[in-house]
Amino acid sequence: MNLCSSGATASTTSLSSTGQAERSGGVPGGGAEGGGGSGNSGGGGKTSNGSAEAPTLCFAGGSGTAGAIAGTEELSNANSPANGAGGATGSTGSGQQPTGSNGHSHLHNENNANMPPETRPKMVTVKHPESNKPKPTTKKSKPIQADQDVIKALQRCRDEGIKRLDLSKSSITVIPSTVKECVHLTELYLYSNKIGQLPPEIGCLVSLRNLALNENSLTSLPESLQNCSQLKVLDLRHNKLAEIPPVIYRLRSLTTLYLRFNRITAVADDLRQLVNLTMLSLRENKIRELGSAIGALVNLTTLDVSHNHLEHLPEDIGNCVNLSALDLQHNELLDIPDSIGNLKSLVRLGMRYNRLSSVPATLKNCKSMDEFNVEGNGITQLPDGMLASLSGLTTITLSRNQFASYPTGGPAQFTNVYSINLEHNRIDKIPYGIFSRAKGLTKLNMKENMLTALPLDIGTWVNMVELNLATNALQKLPDDIMNLQNLEILILSNNMLKKIPNTIGNLRKLRILDLEENRIEVLPHEIGLLHELQRLILQTNQITMLPRSIGHLGNLTHLSVSENNLQFLPEEIGSLESLENLYINQNPGLEKLPFELALCQNLKYLNIDKCPLSTIPPEIQAGGPSLVLQWLKMHSPYRQM
């Protein structure tokens, strides 16, 4: 039996309340193809020369755009949404006509709507003794079932020669066999529905080029899909596929294949047949091995196999010489093959969070790379001079590894770099002059290392904007830090600092200063010169008083001085007009608060826990910070202001 023979079409007389849509004239499918509709379901109108335009049909919740299909997927580790659950909808209740698989329900209610008012059945409310909730004896009609509307949409698609059909986000569970009649279709969007399987008749759409099936409940594909020999883009993200359906390997015209977030465990050798693929995404599956067949896909430009269970890559990966983006992050890779050096077009290589102890020296051949990221591995050192060979690098991320020193290669390796992240390693020294050529370096993260001192040439880092030195063993800051006048963020928490140099006042662009958990006893008066400061974090130190100049910090919104030895707060704190959060908890010597605190009109949060505030009645303190502020306002000499 030929599934694609026209035959008799199913009767839809009882399904249509408005009749067949009016034709706009011309030959169905003639003229220009409708592009990028906005969700309208109207047919194509005549063009200015009188020829008919092939319309685009969008349905129900569809967006009218091809948003489900992208040219490439980002090499990100963003969380993926859960799969859409499958299953039928529209269970029946008492007093309701059962709903059939074709969605022909509530027809009697539609007829009732056309009756004269005097002949319609009345809505009678009955109150049951055991319930206060009124229960109607006749149920109100529900919206037309989504699967029923699909029949209408397909009929219109057939009649008007529509080339682009968007049925996305419509709670569809079944695609009827009448889809075979939509032979003009080149784009079909069925994403974000509840489809469990496709009918064999899908193979009749021989002109199809784009097919979006992502976010459904598919476990397989019909063999007839191989008849769609012009298919270029196939999107199967977020389904329930336990394997790559064999029919896919016979779709040799495919250029883009998305299989992200399924349950695939293996890739068959037949993959080598898809020689026209330029984009392949197998992200977030359960694949343990990528066979040699991958090397046959010489036209690939983007390959995403991240978030799987790969331990090795085949040497054949080096045959994919057109790759510009290769995402291997979040696997269990123990090594990278030397053939990776053949990928001279590579711009982005994601190797984060694997089990690598080294990377091959051949990577220095990949001179087009602009980002080098091996975060979350066990690497102790990079091949000598490798970073210097990659002269196009702008960001380098070596965090969460086992580096005991900076990579070898000298200042040349950072010439064009603007961001360096070496967080969470075992580095005890920043080499003198290592950044002498890094004129564009604006961000350095050395958090969680073993630094005991900063290099003497720190004053030459004049373009630095963000400097994170938290969780080291620093005992002092050099006075030359005053030269970092572009600095906006300075993180020095969890060190062994006893004082802050007066030259800190030269950092006039500073917005965030974090000195938490040090051994600081006194803040310099020059702190008041930081007029752009928004967050000042001083908690867990040994500070006994805040300088009166703190009142000059007009942009300060967050001040934390908890867990110190404060005896009082300066009355100038009332000048902090932008202050929203104030933490002064756990200062055992703080017995009173200045009335001027009531002048901080934007203060939203005040933490005074474990402060012996003897001047404020206990019942006021027990009422919480808001009541304390109210008390201060009521008893303040400024209450008339």
From Swiss-Prot:
Residues 26-47, 84-93 have a biased composition (Gly residues). LRR repeats lie at residues 161-182, 184-205, 207-228, 230-251, 253-274, 276-297, 299-320, 322-343, 345-367, 368-389, 392-413, 416-437, 440-461, 463-484, 486-507, 509-530, 532-553, 555-576, 578-600, 602-623. InterPro entries: Leu-rich_rpt, Leu-rich_rpt_typical-subtyp, LRR-SigEffector_domain, LRR_dom_sf, LRR_R13L4/SHOC2-like. The keyword Mitochondrion does not apply. Transmembrane segments: none annotated. GO terms for molecular function: volume-sensitive anion channel activity. Acts as a Ras effector and participates in MAPK pathway activation. Probably acts as a regulatory subunit of protein phosphatase that specifically dephosphorylates Raf kinase and stimulate Raf activity at specialized signaling complexes upon Ras activation. Belongs to the SHOC2 family. This is Leucine-rich repeat protein soc-2 homolog. It comes from Drosophila melanogaster (Fruit fly). The lineage of its organism: Eukaryota, Metazoa, Ecdysozoa, Arthropoda, Hexapoda.
